[in-house]
């Protein structure tokens, strides 16, 4: 009882054709195809316009500056 036979599918297709008609179904399928094409084109455009990340800048940790960094102890109290 739970499965649909070929006759069930034929009846369902016949009812759909009677309700919507051949013209509306073909128009609907054309709109779906056009939407899929637009979606794929949008995905391709996004890949083309994606910017490359900037080059990684490295810092020289051994470089000395004229003034030492300002270091304060957070937990210490001034005496």
UniProtKB/Swiss-Prot annotation:
What family classification does the UniProt entry report for this protein?
Belongs to the TatA/E family.
Question: How does this chain sit within the bilayer?
Answer: Single-pass membrane protein
Using the UniProt record, give the first listed, main subcellular location. Answer: membrane
Asked if the Swiss-Prot or TrEMBL record annotates the protein with the keyword Transmembrane, the reply is: yes
Region of interest (Disordered), ranges: 42-79
Q: What is this protein called?
A: Sec-independent protein translocase protein TatA
Which spans are transmembrane here? 1-21
UniProt keywords (A-Z) are:
Cell inner membrane, Cell membrane, Membrane, Protein transport, Translocation, Transmembrane, Transmembrane helix, Transport
Per the record, GO CC terms? TAT protein transport complex
Q: Which NCBIfam families match?
A: PRK00720.1, tatAE
Q: Name one Pfam family in it.
A: TatA_B_E
Cellular compartments annotated = Cell inner membrane
The UniProt subunit note reads as follows: The Tat system comprises two distinct complexes: a TatABC complex, containing multiple copies of TatA, TatB and TatC subunits, and a separate TatA complex, containing only TatA subunits. Substrates initially bind to the TatABC complex, which probably triggers association of the separate TatA complex to form the active translocon.
Gene3D superfamilies reported in the protein's UniProt record? 1.20.5.3310
List, in alphabetical order, the Gene Ontology terms for molecular function in this entry. protein transmembrane transporter activity
Q: Which GO terms describe its biological process?
A: protein transport by the Tat complex
Its biological purpose: Part of the twin-arginine translocation (Tat) system that transports large folded proteins containing a characteristic twin-arginine motif in their signal peptide across membranes. TatA could form the protein-conducting channel of the Tat system.
Biased region (Polar residues) positions are 61-70
